[in-house]
Swiss-Prot record:
NCBIfam families from the UniProt entry: PRK10559.1 (NF007850), RND_mfp (TIGR01730)
Superkingdom of the organism of origin: Bacteria
UniProt organism field: Escherichia fergusonii (strain ATCC 35469 / DSM 13698 / CCUG 18766 / IAM 14443 / JCM 21226 / LMG 7866 / NBRC 102419 / NCTC 12128 / CDC 0568-73)
Major subcellular location class: membrane
Entry protein name: p-hydroxybenzoic acid efflux pump subunit AaeA
Residue intervals passing through the bilayer: 12-32
InterPro entries (UniProt xref): CusB-like_dom_1, CusB_D23, MFP_Efflux_Pump, PHBA_efflux_pump_AaeA, RND_pump_MFP
Subcellular location, record wording: Cell inner membrane
PANTHER family in alphabetical order: P-HYDROXYBENZOIC ACID EFFLUX PUMP SUBUNIT AAEA (PTHR30367:SF12), P-HYDROXYBENZOIC ACID EFFLUX PUMP SUBUNIT AAEA-RELATED (PTHR30367)
Keyword check for Cell wall biogenesis/degradation: no
Gene that encodes it: aaeA
Family: Belongs to the membrane fusion protein (MFP) (TC 8.A.1) family.
Protein topology in the membrane: Single-pass membrane protein
Function in brief: Forms an efflux pump with AaeB.
Record HAMAP family: AaeA
């Protein structure tokens, strides 16, 4: 009898442990697959593609690749003598037409004052027409001068904002054309995270919700807030025009093919250049408040660890 009871007890304990293990695994799996999180996230930042507005030989490069620069700092300079001569020529034209306009204005004023008693109406009208023509030529010369001055100013390419120079591909002595990208500037204090959430997890994502960001290969957890959710995406397999919307390739996970939607996350603190734009991270949306790790159950902690491998 005692032997039977011991066998039943062991069987019951084993059964209870199996049930508890199944429940634990099931809860961890549900939390792992259905909670709002993703490993497909990227650090991003505002990037300015810097291109000159004038063409010419590069005479001086004042920065090096990946250098932190300040707004207004000179990046490189394009050969200036050609534009200085163009400005001098334009200023000479303005001076010439200014003198000529003054002469024609005096002539027209004199003829208008004398009137038809001293000369014909045709001669008076002709003087007025010549004056208007010279004034138009003066205005054109002034516009050409202003444009030449602007071109000369733009031979010096400056940083439009504080940030890091990256992908610098210009060198002294090279000829650069107007509008060709010379360098990219990653603007300082503009870093954010784009988390590509599966559509099945968007129910737990709302603007204002808190988020945890773990950069790949780091144990450091950054805090942030959901800033916005993309209003539309297009499927990469679609033949229709995306009309400017983000094109996201769907990942095949098990047998479900869920579309992913970009979620923009505003960082509480800027990481500077520690994690460059384009690097990956894991993002967990914790809800309206930050997650209190001290209150996490064993199952929840295990689910968080599973994310590092899934």
């Amino acid at each position: 009898m005692k032997t039977l009871i011991r066998k039943l007890t062991r069987t019951a304990i084993t059964l209870v442990l199996v049930i508890l293990a199944f429940i634990a695994i099931f809860r961890a799996w549900v939390y792992y697959t259905e909670s709002p999180w993703t490993r497909d996230a990227r650090f991003s930042a505002d990037v300015v593609a810097i291109a000159p507005d004038v063409a010419g030989l590069i005479t001086n490069v004042n920065v090096h690749d990946n250098q932190l620069v300040k707004k207004g700092q000179v990046l490189f300079t394009i050969d200036q003598p050609r534009y200085q001569k163009a400005l001098a020529e334009a200023e000479a034209d303005v001076a010439y037409y200014s003198v000529l306009a003054q002469e024609k204005r005096q002539e027209a004023s004199r003829r208008n004052r004398l009137g038809v008693q001293a000369m014909s109406r045709e001669e008076i009208d002709q003087a007025n027409n010549v004056l208007q023509t010279v004034l138009h030529q003066l205005a054109k010369a002034q516009a050409t001068r202003d444009l030449a001055k602007l071109d000369l100013e733009r031979t010096v390419i400056r940083a439009p904002a504080d940030g890091w120079v990256t992908n610098l591909n210009v060198y002294t002595g090279e000829f650069i054309t107007r509008g060709s990208t010379a360098v990219a500037l990653v603007k300082q204090n503009t870093f954010y995270v784009l988390a590509y959430m599966e559509e099945t997890k968007l129910e737990g994502v709302r603007p204002g919700y808190r988020a945890e960001i773990t950069p790949l290969g780091s144990n450091r957890v950054l805090k942030g807030t959901v800033d916005s959710i993309a209003a539309g995406v297009t499927n990469a397999s679609s033949t229709r025009d995306a009309k400017g919307m983000a094109t996201i390739d769907s990942n095949l996970e098990w047998v479900r093919l869920a579309q992913r939607v970009p979620v923009r996350i505003r960082l509480d603190a800027q990481p500077e250049n520690l994690w460059p734009a384009g690097t990956t991270a894991t993002v967990v949306v914790t809800g309206k408040d930050d997650r209190d790790e001290s209150q996490d159950s064993f199952f929840r902690k295990m689910a968080h660890r599973l994310r590092e491998f899934g």
